[in-house]
Amino acid sequence: MARVCQVTGKGPMVGNNVSHANNKTKRRFLPNLHYRRFWLETENRWVRLRISNAALRLIDKVGIEQVVADLRARGEL
């Protein structure tokens, strides 16, 4: 699926643009996605993920090995 974080599952949200005159038109709030490469020491290879900024912080916190293990358990990698 496009514009979805591979780690957290964050996707686009729907909301409104609100003008000064309080007119409302529909808009999409897109997640802050980036393609990033991570080196897996255990497999001696790079893995390329499309992740949000929140997922990048999660990887900094728990480590890429744990995140990849969770992705494999869900069957997404």
UniProtKB/Swiss-Prot annotation:
Record-level GO cellular component terms: cytosolic large ribosomal subunit
GO MF annotations, alphabetized: structural constituent of ribosome
SUPFAM superfamilies xref list: L28p-like
Keyword tRNA processing among record annotations: no
A Pfam family this chain is assigned to: Ribosomal_L28
InterPro entries from the UniProt entry: Ribosomal_bL28, Ribosomal_bL28/bL31-like_sf, Ribosomal_bL28_bact-type, Ribosomal_bL28_sf
UniProt similarity note: Belongs to the bacterial ribosomal protein bL28 family.
Protein name, UniProt field: Large ribosomal subunit protein bL28
